[in-house]
Curated annotation (Swiss-Prot):
It catalyses: guanosine(26) in tRNA + 2 S-adenosyl-L-methionine = N(2)-dimethylguanosine(26) in tRNA + 2 S-adenosyl-L-homocysteine + 2 H(+). It comes from Methanocaldococcus jannaschii (strain ATCC 43067 / DSM 2661 / JAL-1 / JCM 10045 / NBRC 100440) (Methanococcus jannaschii). This is tRNA (guanine(26)-N(2))-dimethyltransferase. Its EC number is 2.1.1.216. Pfam families: TRM (PF02005). InterPro entries: SAM-dependent_MTases_sf (IPR029063), Trm1 (IPR002905), TRM1_arc_bac (IPR022923), tRNA_met_Trm1_C (IPR042296). Belongs to the class I-like SAM-binding methyltransferase superfamily. Trm1 family.
Amino acid sequence: MILKEGEVVFEVPDKLTVTKKDEVFYNPRMKTCRDISIAVIQAFLNLYHKRDKFYIADALAGSGIRGLRYAKELEFNGELKVFLNDINPKAYEKIINNAKLNEIENIDVFNEDANTFLSKHFRFFNVVDIDPFGSPAPYVEQAIRALVTRNGLLCLTATDTAALCGRSKKSCLRKYLAYPLFGRDCHEFALRVLVGYVMRMATKYELALKPVFCHATDHYVRVYLVTDRGAKRADKVFEMLGYVKDVNGIKIIKKFEEGYEKGFAGPLYIGNLYDKALVEEALKIAEKREFSERVLKILNAIKGESAINQVGCYDTHQIGKMLKISVPPMQDIINKLKEMGFNAVVTHYNPKGIKTDATLKNVIEAIYQCTKIR
């Protein structure tokens, strides 16, 4: 069966399934994720990459659609090359055939274990993309080692949201060495746990990673982190880590150096998840390339979030239950908070979640005022 995604046509098995047993894995539900990846990596190229070569690794390539789209759709004046790898021999053959189908030549294809492939390319790639079925944790260290130590971009997908979102705490502790936070904004804390884990793993190599873009969509979370080198920079990473406890919608935050206390989630990242300039550039690129309304909606929401450094969000449904009132429309609450002098947006991951620099007391006041108006 021949399909098209972005500017790439490709062949997949007639029966599309999404399990680990698939001979050659392709998930059509991840098109939104791949579209956003194109926008984010292109934005990174435009803003931060100053050299004449740009090498990308797609270490778990499956049918190759992600890596082939990078090779064909990313715009760069210098040498752009994508290295696609999959341990499955049939996937390896499929990638080669799909590349021929699209007349794509700026690629190399490998048939190896992902960690073996990455270990053979020490400090080589400008971008390493890990898009597994499940957790990226088994590949994180080799992915970090395969990146250039300054302005390298690490892109990770995790589909094990039961662990990261707190439904399986032991699994999260085992994979990410952290306790998750289960609640209305658990998807944001899934991002923060994953980012915090990656940052900690990098410090042993005297590398400081920081997030520049993240999103939680459908059944997965996706994070993008940029590398920088130096022991002092790596030491400062721990200042951006901590522990969080949710008490009736209020987030209590402890610094990493204070240590773990029972009932808290973490260690996790407690800083801003976004590089505002990169988010704005990615949105411009997505608009120019006429990506789907859904992609634009996600990027627009994240643009608003990037200007607010709040850990978690206020869930209006939870507040309504607590106050025993009917919650007014979200946009009314947002407008009221802005009238009160605060910045406020609806989160991209929770349609009932508000990210704002206001306190919970201010949010409750805004809800009451909107209720009276109605």
